[in-house]
Amino acid sequence: SRGLGDVYKRQTRACRRAWPRTMIVKLSPNVTDIASIACAVEAEGADSVSLINTLLGMAVDVERQRPVLSTVTGGLSGPAVKPVAVRMVWQVAKAVKIPVIGLGGIMTGADALEFIMAGATAVQVGTANFVHPDTGTRIVDYLQDYCLRHGVADISELRGIV
């Protein structure tokens, strides 16, 4: 991650010089120390970080004795990556002062709440939208209901509580 951290720093610095508006830097999970990279981009002027992207994966067709994907490896996303994503959001949220946008495997309101409790300021939904186009509405409804049931006045009270 150290070499990649330097790349993130240089790219963030260059973008910040050219772009005065809000800059959200998306971080890859395919690193050993995502928190240090988040700190580096924060120091170079990122307004927020977004994590995670897909994990590198591979599948083998045992009958054909070759990789399933023509590219051999590919991006793993959806519910399978959620535990990794929540951990990385938790690590980054503890390390930076800028907002953290959590994503990776969010299918339900409870999933979104896990990210918020781990420190995410906001969440992003991808794969679930293909399954249920109304996922965003379902998540908002769940969060509102959860807050009512638990006497929470504002969702931000739950941010980073774990």
Residue locations for each model-derived region?
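Glycine/Thr-rich beta-alpha phosphate-binding loop at enzyme active sites
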Residues: 37-98
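Non-catalytic positions within long, well-ordered alpha-helices that form the structural scaffold/packing
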Residues: 16, 42-43, 116
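Short, small-residue-biased leader/transition segments that mark boundaries at the very start
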Residues: 1-8
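Active-site beta-loop-alpha junctions enriched in small/polar residues
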Residues: 26-32, 52-56, 105-107, 128
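Alpha/beta catalytic cores of nucleotide-metabolism and tRNA/nucleoside-modifying enzymes
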Residues: 76-97, 101, 107-162
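Short beta-strand/loop segments at the ligand-binding rim of alpha/beta enzyme cores
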Residues: 18-29, 94-103
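Generic structural signal for well-ordered alpha-helices
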Residues: 9-13, 35-39, 89, 112, ...
